């Protein structure tokens, strides 16, 4: 058996050189575009969600409802704290006194002397207006804090508002 050589392959023959006129006459060679892939890859189908990793539709629904309920309860509580001192509503169930205040002046004074309302009505309305306006700044600062921060961060403003409302309720 003859031995085979494992040396380098024989050199290739060089192509004959073309003259400038022949090179200009031939059109340039174009390469064929690469063949398109025969199989288009598709995304794998979504896998089924294992139990416990996602709460699902009803879990999300219950969670949202709980959040709305808690938010509503906190909002109503804050609203009643802010407006409770001004509207006269509170936890007591005593009926409101709707009687007209009695004037200490005699009825012999003509009504034109003091206007359309007796003097005692002017005094009581001035006090209630003053009470409403006295705590307005505290209520606004508390409301601004609630809008920008957590409820727990606004406890200082809540205490100031409660103190103001208590002070004015004792003076009336």
Curated annotation (Swiss-Prot):
Transmembrane segments: none annotated. It comes from the Eukaryota. GO terms for cellular component: cytosol; mitochondrial intermembrane space; mitochondrion; nucleus. InterPro entries: CHCHD2/10-like, Cys_alpha_HP_mot_SF. Residues 89-109 have a biased composition (Polar residues). GO terms for biological process: mitochondrion organization. Residues 30-47 have a biased composition (Pro residues). Residues 14-29 have a biased composition (Low complexity). Residues 1-54, 82-111 are annotated as: Disordered. This is Uncharacterized protein C6C3.02c. It comes from Schizosaccharomyces pombe (strain 972 / ATCC 24843) (Fission yeast).
């Amino acid at each position: 058996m003859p031995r085979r050589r494992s040396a380098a392959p024989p050199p290739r023959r060089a192509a004959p050189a073309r003259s400038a006129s022949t090179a200009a006459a031939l059109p340039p060679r174009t390469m064929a575009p690469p063949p398109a892939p025969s199989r288009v890859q598709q995304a794998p189908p979504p896998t089924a969600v294992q139990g416990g990793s996602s709460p699902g539709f009803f879990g999300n629904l219950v969670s949202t409802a709980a959040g709305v309920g808690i938010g509503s309860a906190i909002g109503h509580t804050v609203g009643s704290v802010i407006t409770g001192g001004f509207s006269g509503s509170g936890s007591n169930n005593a009926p409101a006194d709707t009687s007209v205040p009695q004037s200490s002046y005699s009825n012999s004074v003509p009504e034109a002397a003091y206007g359309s309302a007796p003097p005692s009505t002017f005094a009581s309305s001035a006090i209630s207006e003053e009470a409403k306006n006295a705590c307005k700044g505290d209520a606004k600062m508390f409301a601004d804090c609630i809008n920008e921060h957590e409820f727990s961060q606004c406890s200082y403003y809540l205490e100031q508002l409660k103190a103001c409302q208590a002070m004015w309720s004792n003076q009336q």
